[in-house]
């Protein structure tokens, strides 16, 4: 009965466990069975706490049974139900205090407790802890503690329960220690899939729209990537072949329970790994290249000899589980993962990462020996152009760039780095993308004015109609040019979406309104004239939509841009020559003295006249978000695109999709002269060429280019931005010389003498 005489009379802990005199048949375990005696031999003293809840009533909803100090199993360090003397039980019966236990209990057999004993039967009920709430150097139950996890004095504080982070560590460590047999994980998978056969009429798991997790997005007939895991566990390996690291498609790699003393730096080549197990080896350090494995979700390093961890682990922003149990790690590292978990430790390593040595400067590649000194301002017929996506502050978030330290992402830090880089290159023409209005008007225009730059800027279309403060955050395109070298003749902006809907053939074309019009990407066009030579130049600064799922939109945006540029070029041909081309000069030097060797200013040449739009030199710079070989690339390079191109996906865009796309300019990528760079955008999830400097090859010639980034530096850096590169894009720079116009050959007139001789 719940309301009997002994309603609240519960026995002491001693009556739930065997007393010393009751175990004469186990004398070897007497030291484990000594109990702190209770004040009542019978254990039937009534509790004075009248608020104690009835054991027959469920605890309140806001109270966990494990937090009730009067329940039988109140140990805070064990999360498993019905644990007696550290062992899991198959029988779940409540011991009754009114009945004496028999002398022998076969199902409560006592087992010796060792600090590092491994349970091979019940991993889910592992009870030997090497850290946290229990010491790994003492017995589980000391004379000061009862076996149910509470102290002998009910007034003493109960130990703080072990948190979920360390519980997970211990459980995973126990599972790892069990997996010591050769090819344990491969055999486990084979056992699970035993008897399962795939028939030809089975449905493709991807056909229902569910994407396969951790599967390379390759063509289905790529048989090699049908297997993405390797298990070398329990082989006694002492070294790894370099050939292993050529399998860059690997998703899981098991190297556990071997005798590896070191891990090759080539491990950084396996960038697709999501699971890496190097537990139970003899490792004393982890190579810095481990930071290149940014797709890792689980990294297990149990039972090695690691005393520290490389700061490059901070790059692993997707890591959910880092197993470090069984290593003599420094307290600052171990305590953080014990108390706050893997994410906290990774963030700590990322933020505390020291600044590495900067890479060597990118080479300036001379393609034409006559232009060797022109980068510093030599021949007036030559000029340099730079394009740079600066990564707008609004887009540089910790969620998007989780591998970058907060200090390296801070806009104040990055904008100074950007400014110094632009000033260092000192290009005649600078095209910047992703510059917000606030940064352009409040920083770059003012700062670059000290370097003789004048600027033209337009924000993206969504800035129209916004409040002023909100509009400042909208990014756009800015084009700067040296004021002492060029005169601005005209400037224009192309809003691709608005231009598309104004076309006469846009009626009834739903894709124009549903896909293209909603994107507010733009291009800024400036028409310049060289003060000294009179040569004119069209500079297009474009930023094309980014999403790979909108290849059709990218193609149509570029087609509209080139169509508009063609119309503008035809208008620019008719602009009359400049009459006043003299640059502003101070009447006297700043020191008040005539500078020595000052030469007479060169008389500006008259403006060059052009008979057609295609004769005007043109540069098309920017971030096109399209790789070499794409439809966008081919349209610019070849001047024409067929109407049935697969990137259009049979969508309707008026005459552009019915009749095809074309432009009259003979454009060529500046870097195609030597082969495109390895990349212009560098992040863990995407590394490829998407930025270009296109030039009209009939009027311009490339004479020099800015080269690649230091390859050795990139072996330990998984992505930009960082402390040396302020954007996820690279700056591209090229030097050009204007080709002289070809005049028609003059035929000699010999008069009537010629006719006589014939």
Curated annotation (Swiss-Prot):
Disulfide bonds: none annotated. Its EC number is 3.1.13.4. Its cofactor is Mg(2+). Residues 22-123, 146-179, 196-217, 584-606 are annotated as: Disordered. Its main location: cytoplasm. This is CCR4-Not complex 3'-5'-exoribonuclease subunit Ccr4. PANTHER family: CARBON CATABOLITE REPRESSOR PROTEIN 4, POLY(A)-SPECIFIC RIBONUCLEASE. One of its GO terms (cellular component) is cytoplasm. The gene is CCR4. LRR repeats lie at residues 224-247, 248-270, 271-294, 296-319. The lineage of its organism: Eukaryota, Fungi, Dikarya, Ascomycota, Pezizomycotina. One of its GO terms (molecular function) is poly(A)-specific ribonuclease activity. Belongs to the CCR4/nocturin family. It catalyses: Exonucleolytic cleavage of poly(A) to 5'-AMP. It is found in: Cytoplasm; Nucleus.
């Amino acid at each position: 009965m719940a309301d009997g005489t002994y309603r609240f009379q519960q026995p002491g802990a001693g009556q739930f466990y065997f007393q010393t005199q009751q175990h004469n048949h186990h004398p070897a375990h007497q030291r484990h069975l000594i109990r702190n005696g209770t004040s009542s031999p019978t254990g039937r003293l009534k509790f004075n706490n009248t608020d104690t809840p009835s054991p027959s009533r469920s605890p309140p909803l806001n109270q966990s049974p494990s937090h009730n100090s009067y329940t039988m199993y109140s140990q805070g360090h064990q999360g498993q139900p019905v644990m007696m003397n550290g062992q899991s039980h198959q029988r779940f019966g409540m011991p009754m205090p009114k009945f004496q236990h028999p002398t022998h209990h076969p199902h409560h057999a006592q087992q010796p407790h060792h600090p590092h004993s491994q349970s091979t039967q019940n991993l889910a009920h592992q009870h030997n802890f090497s850290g946290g709430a229990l010491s790994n150097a003492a017995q589980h139950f000391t004379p000061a503690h009862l076996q149910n996890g509470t102290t002998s004095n009910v007034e003493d504080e109960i130990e703080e329960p072990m948190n979920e982070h360390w519980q997970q560590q211990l459980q995973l460590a126990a599972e790892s220690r069990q997996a010591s047999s050769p090819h344990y994980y491969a055999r486990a998978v084979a056992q699970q899939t035993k008897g399962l056969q795939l028939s030809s009429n089975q449905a493709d798991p991807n056909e229902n729209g569910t994407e396969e997790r951790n599967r390379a997005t390759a063509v289905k007939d790529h048989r090699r990537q049908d297997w993405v895991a390797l298990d070398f566990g329990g082989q006694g390996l002492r070294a790894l072949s370099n050939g292993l690291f050529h399998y860059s498609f690997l998703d899981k790699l098991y190297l556990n329970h071997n005798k590896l003393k070191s891990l090759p730096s080539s491990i950084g080549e396996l960038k697709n790994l999501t699971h890496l197990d190097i537990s139970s080896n003899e490792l004393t350090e982890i190579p810095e290249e481990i930071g290149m494995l940014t797709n890792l979700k689980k990294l297990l390093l149990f039972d090695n000899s690691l005393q520290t961890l490389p700061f490059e682990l901070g790059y692993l922003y997707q890591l959910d589980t880092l197993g470090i149990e069984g290593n003599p790690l420094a307290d600052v590292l171990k305590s953080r993962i014990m108390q706050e978990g893997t994410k906290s430790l990774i963030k700590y390593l990322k933020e505390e990462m020291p600044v590495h040595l900067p890479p060597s400067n990118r080479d300036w590649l001379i393609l034409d020996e006559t232009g060797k000194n022109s980068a510093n301002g030599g021949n007036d017929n030559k000029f340099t152009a730079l394009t740079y996506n600066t990564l707008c502050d609004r887009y540089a978030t910790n969620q998007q760039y989780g591998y970058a330290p907060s200090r390296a992402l801070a806009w104040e830090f990055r904008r100074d780095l950007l400014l110094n880089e632009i000033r260092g290159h000192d290009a005649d023409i600078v095209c910047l993308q992703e510059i917000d209005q606030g940064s352009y008007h409040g920083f770059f225009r003012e700062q670059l004015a000290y370097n003789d730059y004048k600027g033209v800027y337009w924000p993206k279309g969504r800035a129209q109609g916004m409040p002023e403060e909100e509009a400042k955050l909208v990014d756009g395109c800015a084009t700067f040019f040296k004021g002492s070298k060029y005169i601005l003749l005209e400037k224009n902006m192309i809003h691709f979406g608005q231009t598309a809907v104004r076309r006469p053939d846009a009626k009834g074309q739903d894709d124009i309104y549903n896909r293209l019009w909603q994107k507010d990407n733009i291009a800024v066009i400036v028409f310049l004239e060289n003060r000294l030579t009179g040569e004119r130049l069209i500079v297009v600064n474009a930023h094309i939509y980014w999403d790979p799922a909108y290849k059709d939109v990218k193609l149509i945006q570029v087609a509209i841009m080139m169509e508009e540029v063609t119309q503008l070029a035809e208008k620019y041909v008719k602009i009359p020559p400049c009459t006043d081309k003299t640059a502003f000069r101070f009447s006297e030097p700043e020191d008040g003295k005539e500078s020595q060797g000052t030469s007479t200013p060169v008389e500006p040449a008259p403006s060059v006249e052009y008979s057609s739009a295609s004769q005007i030199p043109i540069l098309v710079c920017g971030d096109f978000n399209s790789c070499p070989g794409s439809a966008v690339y081919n349209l610019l390079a070849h001047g024409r695109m067929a109407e049935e191109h697969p990137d259009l996906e049979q969508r309707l865009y008026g005459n552009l999709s019915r009749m095809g796309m074309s432009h009259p300019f003979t454009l060529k990528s500046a870097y195609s002269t030597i082969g495109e760079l390895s990349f212009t955008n560098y992040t863990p999830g995407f590394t490829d060429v998407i930025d270009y400097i296109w030039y009209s090859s009939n009027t311009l010639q490339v004479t020099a280019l800015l080269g690649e980034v230091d390859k050795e530096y990139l072996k330990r850096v998984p992505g930009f931005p960082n402390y040396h590169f302020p954007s996820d894009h690279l700056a591209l720079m090229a030097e050009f010389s204007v080709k002289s116009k070809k005049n028609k050959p003059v035929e000699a007139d010999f008069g009537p003498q010629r006719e006589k001789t014939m």
